[in-house]
From Swiss-Prot:
Domain commentary: Consists of 3 domains; the N-terminus binds the ribosome, the middle domain has PPIase activity, while the C-terminus has intrinsic chaperone activity on its own.
Keywords from the UniProt entry: Cell cycle, Cell division, Chaperone, Cytoplasm, Isomerase, Rotamase
Gene designation: tig
Function per UniProt: Involved in protein export. Acts as a chaperone by maintaining the newly synthesized protein in an open conformation. Functions as a peptidyl-prolyl cis-trans isomerase.
GO terms for cellular component: cytoplasm
EC number: 5.2.1.8
Protein name, UniProt field: Trigger factor
Chief localisation class: cytoplasm
Entry superkingdom: Bacteria
Amino acid sequence: MKSTVETLSPTRVRLAIEVPFVELEPSLKKAYREIGQQVQVPGFRRGKVPAVVIDQRVGRGTVLNEAVQEAIPQNILAAVREHDLKTLGRPEVEITEFTDGDSLNFTAEVDVRPELTLPDLSTVEVTVDELKIDDSEIDEQVQSLRERFATLKTVDRAAGEGDFVQIDLNATVDGEEVPGGSASNLSHEVGSKQLLPGLDEAVVGLAAGASTTFTTQLVGGDHAGRDAEVSVTVRTVKEKELPELDDEFAELASEFDTMAELRDDVRERVTRGKRVEQIYAARDKALEQIVEAADVPAPEGVVREEVESRKTAMVDQLERIGASMEEYLAAEEKTEEQIDTELNEAAVQGVKIQLLLDTVADAEDVQVSDDEFGHEIVHRAQRAGVAPQQFYDQLVRSGAAGAVYGDVRRGKALASIMDRITIRDAAGEPVSLDALRAENEAEHAHAE
């Protein structure tokens, strides 16, 4: 096999590969063997059909085509190794010349990792918001906890904001019932805007047994975009009874004996959450700054594949919740072109960051231990709700284990970046990663 490489851009090359016919012999033998297992010829056992008979039955061209398709990836891989290329995505192959008995000539265009010049990471400095905790934020968290322990009490009055109502609904368009537009005994919190637009306004002021109608625009189904007349009947009205914020509540709702201890714990958790937000903000700003300084290009083919992957994931997620892309677009008040633009922008930045982290990992010779890889497998298996070994086996079968390994390696490269940059808040005070790590370790130790 002979090969040459032509640089088309900083992120794309064209390989020109010539494979002598004699080097195709192993692929030809394999093609004859596999085709021989599939055809039935009287007088011959399956798999024992002579090549000349196979040529007569299916044609020599069919065998050659199968051999070529099997040989091309192998020779691309050999050429990639010969020229020490770091390829990305799938190659685009074009056979330029091939006849029976002569050399196979083809080209393969493929995206490659660009050569990047990294800035001195120790000179990178980012600024994030100050860590400020207001008492109102603590009050909000405590109130949220209080709401979780509320009880519902039936009342003999009209429904108001924050009440829970049991309702019956029936929707019609032009006097005809909407398929799936009826429901009985639904529980709804007034003011939550969880169901139909206009429902909250309609039920305010209605007591048990009262009915009314309102108009709403349908976002899904055969009548999407049309106005529907909806009748609603209130069965019951219930109000929330909140527990008193005293030491008894602290014992009920937490591991603490007093409200003072509970509030202190809430403050610590809010503080930790804001520290995490600071670090995330610092991470995003640092990566954006370094990507710009390193002038990281985004290979078009890789970006295209990433956009397709993200859009497929979006559609799958919508299907899991029983929604369509059309319904999503209506709810977000966006066009498909706007969604595509957003996906493309996110994909471009994501690909640039991935290339940057790979370069940092190479420059610092980042390694992933078996324990680190295994921990990631366990973590992902838990999120997927399957056993770790089953999850790993699925990765191996799908050829995705290497991608997970790459993610772990990039994560370690990112951690290295974060350790070397300078982070300050808006007041000029340094923001330390060590404090957050110590808190997390202490929390994990306490949980164990």
